[in-house]
Amino acid sequence: MRSKHNELKSPIMSCSKRMEWKSILSPLIFRQQMILTQNLNQKLKTIKVCMHRIQKLSKLKALYRGL
């Protein structure tokens, strides 16, 4: 049990393990960021469309009030 503990404490091991994890996780993190960005962009487009429709409806409402 003690030898495993010492292995984990070894700076060379931890550094190589970290590099291994980074090389594995980096593409996954990048992919997740891309997906999140696409989702946010889609939501932003939806919000813009809704705001445009609300503006149109307010103009129509103002026109009907004027009649």
Curated annotation (Swiss-Prot):
<protein>
    <recommendedName>
        <fullName>Protein C'</fullName>
    </recommendedName>
</protein>
<comment type="function">
    <text>Seems to stimulates transcription by the viral polymerase. May play a role in viral pathogenesis or transmission by insects vectors.</text>
</comment>
<comment type="similarity">
    <text>Belongs to the rhabdoviruses C protein family.</text>
</comment>
